[in-house]
A protein has these predicted regions:
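Feature marks proteins synthesized as precursors that undergo proteolytic processing into two chains
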Residues: 1-161
Length: 161
C-alpha cells in the first residue's frame, strides 16, 4: 500500500484557524515542552512500549532508537520517557507553523527517508498537501449511528456500506 501524505499538522492548523482562540505557538509549544521534559510512564504504557520496542519496532532501527530505553532493557512503571526529536519537531511547528513540517527541514527529512526506503512521498507532495473540510460519512450498525471520516479515510467499506 502506498502511504498518504501525513495530514495531521495541516489539519490541526485548519481547525485552529477556524476555531482557535489562542495563538498557534501557545497551543503547540506545550507538546514540545512535554516531549523535552518527558513524563513518567504508567505500568501499562511502559509494558506496551517495551513489547513494541522488543518486537514490532525491530525492523525499524530509528524507532527503536527513539522509543527504546537508553542503555537497553525494558521500560518500567515510573520511568521517564523523553523524546528529544519530537520536542525539536514540535518546537519548529510551534514557531514556524505547518510549513516547518511540509516545506521546511522536517519535510526534507521525511522525503529523504521515503526515498531511502522505497517510499513514494516526495518533497513536492508534502508541499502541495492541503487539509480539507468534508462532511462526515454516517451510517447505522446494529442500531447505532456510526460517524466516520469521509473518503479517502473512511470505515464505510467495512461498516457503512
Amino acid at each position: 500500500l502506498a502511504p498518504g501524505v501525513p495530514g495531521t499538522v495541516r489539519g490541526m492548523a485548519l481547525a485552529h484557524k477556524r476555531f482557535g482562540k489562542l495563538p498557534w505557538k501557545d497551543v503547540v509549544m506545550p507538546a514540545a515542552e512535554l516531549a523535552d521534559k518527558g513524563f513518567v510512564m504508567s505500568e501499562s504504557l511502559a509494558g506496551g512500549l517495551s513489547r513494541e520496542v522488543g518486537r514490532g519496532m525491530q525492523p525499524y532501527p530509528a524507532s527503536v532508537a527513539a522509543y527504546g530505553k537508553r542503555g537497553g532493557g525494558a521500560w518500567a512503571a515510573g520511568d521517564r520517557l523523553i523524546l528529544p526529536d519530537l520536542a525539536k519537531t514540535m518546537s519548529a511547528i510551534a514557531t514556524d507553523g505547518p510549513d516547518a513540517f511540509y516545506t521546511g527541514w522536517i519535510g526534507d527529512l521525511i522525503a529523504k527517508d521515503m526515498a531511502a526506503h522505497g517510499g513514494n512521498i516526495t518533497k513536492a507532495d508534502l508541499a502541495a498537501y492541503q487539509a480539507k473540510e468534508r462532511a462526515p460519512v454516517k451510517g447505522t450498525f446494529l442500531g447505532y449511528e456510526i460517524t466516520s471520516m469521509p473518503p479517502p479515510l473512511t470505515i464505510r467499506a467495512s461498516i457503512g456500506s
